[in-house]
Amino acid sequence: MLEARDLYCERDERTLFRGLSFTVDAGEWVQVTGGNGAGKTTLLRLLTGLARPDGGEVYWQGEPLRRVRDSFHRSLLWIGHQPGIKTRLTARENLHFFHPGDGARLPEALAQAGLAGFEDVPVARLSAGQQRRVALARLWLTRAALWVLDEPFTAIDVNGVARLTRRMAAHTAQGGMVILTTHQPLPGAADTVRRLALTTALVLYALRANIDLFYTPGEILYGKRETQQLPAVGQRLRVGGMVMPGSVRRDPDSLKVNFSLYDAEGSVTVSYEGILPDLFREGQGVVVQGTLEKGNHVLAHEVLAKHDENYTPPEVEKAMQENHRRPQRVDKDTSS
């Protein structure tokens, strides 16, 4: 099992992610998604030990990665955005370099990758897509349990993507693990791949079965704009919205507090037990992390606020722009 625990990463004085926690068990594969600059490649480098996080830890089989680096790397196949092959060698020679004991299997691996007839052509004479296939032919040779692949389908045609996806599915069916970044759909695998969506500067969690991680109140009520899919009761999620004026109710004998979050589409109720951020204010934007309960209620385990009286969570702002309006300020709780 690979585990990311409370990962925090900054680049160029910008927070890419913080509090990022998830696990990848035997037989699972995870697709990391996000816009340019969201930190997808950086996350993969942290997971493979090629870079160190600014906070948090990566664990392999229950042990900190830094303590079991050698055994981890024996279990890892890493193919980065660049093919990582030697252009002066042929396709066959490149595979032999990585898999010297598998000479008899090299032609079949290259054929599976779509390179039949190109085995002895110098890689420098191959197209970008063919060079990528040389690197990906290792998927038919490696005995590594964990595959971490950064944009593996770059310059690969539709048939090649389908063939590679089938290979990944076979690997996970045999108990392997796959983590990849890609903007392309995974033919035949949409129901089995977990998606982890990175949104700059937010705490993110890997959820099950292709559910986006962030919701606005309106999306909880009516579903995502693209799919109309509602979050499931019991699902861990993040909700960003404005704290409804007049909705905050504090228990005088404990740290329990209830309030409502709203956007232009509606409102949801939130309960939380703990110390609220100093910057928590009615009428201002916050992001809560928690679990969705019945009745569109969120049981929160963390509340985040930002030092800006005009702050609106970025995802809420985007949703409002798509709807051509911002959330209206309200004077009372209208969630009931």
From Swiss-Prot:
GO BP annotations, alphabetical order: cytochrome complex assembly
Q: Does the keyword Lyase apply?
A: no
> Where is region (Disordered) located?
307-336
Q: What is its EC number?
A: 7.6.2.5
Instruction: From the UniProt entry, list the residue stretches annotated as the region Cytochrome c biogenesis ATP-binding export protein CcmA 2.
Output: 1-199
UniProt: heme binding residues: 307, 311
PROSITE patterns, per database record: ABC_TRANSPORTER_1, ABC_TRANSPORTER_2, CCMA
Q: Where, in this chain's numbering, is ATP bound? A: 34-41
The yes or no answer to whether the keyword Iron is present is yes
GO molecular function annotations of the record:
ABC-type heme transporter activity; ATP binding; ATP hydrolysis activity; heme binding; metal ion binding
Q: What is the membrane topology noted in the UniProt record heading this document? A: Peripheral membrane protein
Residue ranges of the ABC transporter domain? 2-242
The record's annotation in SMART domains points to:
AAA
Q: Which UniProt keywords apply?
A: ATP-binding, Cell inner membrane, Cell membrane, Cytochrome c-type biogenesis, Heme, Iron, Membrane, Metal-binding, Nucleotide-binding, Translocase, Transport
Chemical reaction(s) catalysed: heme b(in) + ATP + H2O = heme b(out) + ADP + phosphate + H(+)
Q: Where in the cell is it found?
A: Cell inner membrane
Pfam families for the chain: ABC_tran, CcmE
Q: Where do the record's region annotations for Cytochrome c-type biogenesis protein CcmE 2 lie? A: 196-336
**GO CC, alphabetical:** plasma membrane
Q: What class of enzyme is it?
A: translocase
Cross-referenced Gene3D superfamilies: Nucleic acid-binding proteins, P-loop containing nucleotide triphosphate hydrolases
- PANTHER family, sorted: ABC TRANSPORTER I FAMILY MEMBER 1
Sum up the protein's function in the record's words.
Part of the ABC transporter complex CcmAB involved in the biogenesis of c-type cytochromes; once thought to export heme, this seems not to be the case, but its exact role is uncertain. Responsible for energy coupling to the transport system.
Protein family membership:
In the N-terminal section; belongs to the ABC transporter superfamily. CcmA exporter (TC 3.A.1.107) family.
Query: Under which name does UniProt file this protein?
Result: Putative bifunctional cytochrome c-type biogenesis protein CcmAE
Q: Which organism is it from?
A: Salmonella choleraesuis (strain SC-B67)
